[in-house]
Amino acid sequence: MAGKSSLFKIILLGDGGVGKSSLMNRYVTNKFDSQLFHTIGVEFLNKDLEVDGHFVTMQIWDTAGQERFRSLRTPFYRGSDCCLLTFSVDDSQSFQNLSNWKKEFIYYADVKEPESFPFVILGNKTDIKERQVSTEEAQAWCKDNGDYPYFETSAKDSTNVAAAFEEAVRRILATEDRSDHLIQTDTVNLHRKPKPNSSCC
């Protein structure tokens, strides 16, 4: 019998320049490039992992944060299993825009039950000392808007990056019927005997 794992689509949303591409690349490749250009449209990377005994393939989508790329990114929202709303702790405007990003996602992803959809909030760039958004402010927003989990991350030094993505998987596992996500893997039981062909008249 072929082994099965789950395929989860996870999308990163937030203003341009908050570090979405860097977070994805740090998590998947464990590399950080300070010279990354802004994403145009969308791109994605896959990562296989095991979370709490569940084998998962994460399909992580990075989206362009600039307004002029809205028509390019929004068609890819559909089918998402979790949304990582991302802001930069050194940019208060990116924090204030979280509500707009949430609304945009719910609308274009056609989320049927927004109150139960798994969002995870990331306050990125904690390696920068000059903060404009406090931990308390971010936690209060999360509590008021759906009691979402909040992680302060740094793609530069990898702080909490893995923990945030793994929490996204746990949120999906807690809310979704995994049978909708099952995919075949390459593991096959070589000792299984084939069933005899049956026929009927």
Swiss-Prot record:
<feature type="binding site">
    <location>
        <position position="39"/>
    </location>
    <ligand>
        <name>Mg(2+)</name>
    </ligand>
</feature>
<feature type="binding site">
    <location>
        <position position="38"/>
    </location>
    <ligand>
        <name>GTP</name>
    </ligand>
</feature>
<feature type="binding site">
    <location>
        <position position="34"/>
    </location>
    <ligand>
        <name>GTP</name>
    </ligand>
</feature>
<feature type="lipid moiety-binding region" description="S-geranylgeranyl cysteine">
    <location>
        <position position="201"/>
    </location>
</feature>
<keyword id="KW-0449">Lipoprotein</keyword>
<comment type="function">
    <text>The small GTPases Rab are key regulators of intracellular membrane trafficking, from the formation of transport vesicles to their fusion with membranes. Rabs cycle between an inactive GDP-bound form and an active GTP-bound form that is able to recruit to membranes different sets of downstream effectors directly responsible for vesicle formation, movement, tethering and fusion. RAB9A is involved in the transport of proteins between the endosomes and the trans-Golgi network (TGN).</text>
</comment>
<dbReference type="GO" id="GO:0005764">
    <property type="term" value="C:lysosome"/>
</dbReference>
<comment type="subunit">
    <text>Interacts (preferentially in its GTP-bound form) with GCC2 (via its GRIP domain). Interacts (GTP-bound form) with SGSM1; the GDP-bound form has much lower affinity for SGSM1. Interacts with SGSM2. The GTP-bound form but not the GDP-bound form interacts with HPS4 and the BLOC-3 complex (heterodimer of HPS1 and HPS4) but does not interact with HPS1 alone. Interacts (GTP-bound form) with NDE1; two RAB9A-GTP molecules lie on the opposite sides of the NDE1 homodimer; the interaction leads to RAB9A-dynein motor tethering. Interacts (GTP-bound form) with NDEL1.</text>
</comment>
<dbReference type="InterPro" id="IPR027417">
    <property type="entry name" value="P-loop_NTPase"/>
</dbReference>
<feature type="binding site">
    <location>
        <position position="65"/>
    </location>
    <ligand>
        <name>GTP</name>
    </ligand>
</feature>
<dbReference type="GO" id="GO:0042147">
    <property type="term" value="P:retrograde transport, endosome to Golgi"/>
</dbReference>
<dbReference type="GO" id="GO:0003925">
    <property type="term" value="F:G protein activity"/>
</dbReference>
<dbReference type="InterPro" id="IPR001806">
    <property type="entry name" value="Small_GTPase"/>
</dbReference>
<dbReference type="GO" id="GO:0019003">
    <property type="term" value="F:GDP binding"/>
</dbReference>
<feature type="short sequence motif" description="Switch 2">
    <location>
        <begin position="64"/>
        <end position="78"/>
    </location>
</feature>
<feature type="binding site">
    <location>
        <position position="125"/>
    </location>
    <ligand>
        <name>GTP</name>
    </ligand>
</feature>
<keyword id="KW-0472">Membrane</keyword>
<keyword id="KW-0460">Magnesium</keyword>
<feature type="binding site">
    <location>
        <position position="22"/>
    </location>
    <ligand>
        <name>GTP</name>
    </ligand>
</feature>
<keyword id="KW-0342">GTP-binding</keyword>
<feature type="modified residue" description="Phosphoserine">
    <location>
        <position position="34"/>
    </location>
</feature>
<protein>
    <recommendedName>
        <fullName>Ras-related protein Rab-9A</fullName>
        <ecNumber>3.6.5.2</ecNumber>
    </recommendedName>
</protein>
<feature type="short sequence motif" description="Switch 1">
    <location>
        <begin position="31"/>
        <end position="42"/>
    </location>
</feature>
<keyword id="KW-0547">Nucleotide-binding</keyword>
<dbReference type="GO" id="GO:0042470">
    <property type="term" value="C:melanosome"/>
</dbReference>
<feature type="binding site">
    <location>
        <position position="21"/>
    </location>
    <ligand>
        <name>GTP</name>
    </ligand>
</feature>
<dbReference type="GO" id="GO:0005525">
    <property type="term" value="F:GTP binding"/>
</dbReference>
<feature type="modified residue" description="N-acetylalanine">
    <location>
        <position position="2"/>
    </location>
</feature>
<keyword id="KW-0813">Transport</keyword>
<keyword id="KW-0256">Endoplasmic reticulum</keyword>
<feature type="binding site">
    <location>
        <position position="39"/>
    </location>
    <ligand>
        <name>GTP</name>
    </ligand>
</feature>
<dbReference type="GO" id="GO:0032482">
    <property type="term" value="P:Rab protein signal transduction"/>
</dbReference>
<dbReference type="GO" id="GO:0005886">
    <property type="term" value="C:plasma membrane"/>
</dbReference>
<dbReference type="InterPro" id="IPR005225">
    <property type="entry name" value="Small_GTP-bd"/>
</dbReference>
<keyword id="KW-0333">Golgi apparatus</keyword>
<feature type="lipid moiety-binding region" description="S-geranylgeranyl cysteine">
    <location>
        <position position="200"/>
    </location>
</feature>
<dbReference type="GO" id="GO:0005829">
    <property type="term" value="C:cytosol"/>
</dbReference>
<keyword id="KW-0653">Protein transport</keyword>
<feature type="binding site">
    <location>
        <position position="19"/>
    </location>
    <ligand>
        <name>GTP</name>
    </ligand>
</feature>
<keyword id="KW-0007">Acetylation</keyword>
<dbReference type="GO" id="GO:0042802">
    <property type="term" value="F:identical protein binding"/>
</dbReference>
<dbReference type="GO" id="GO:0045921">
    <property type="term" value="P:positive regulation of exocytosis"/>
</dbReference>
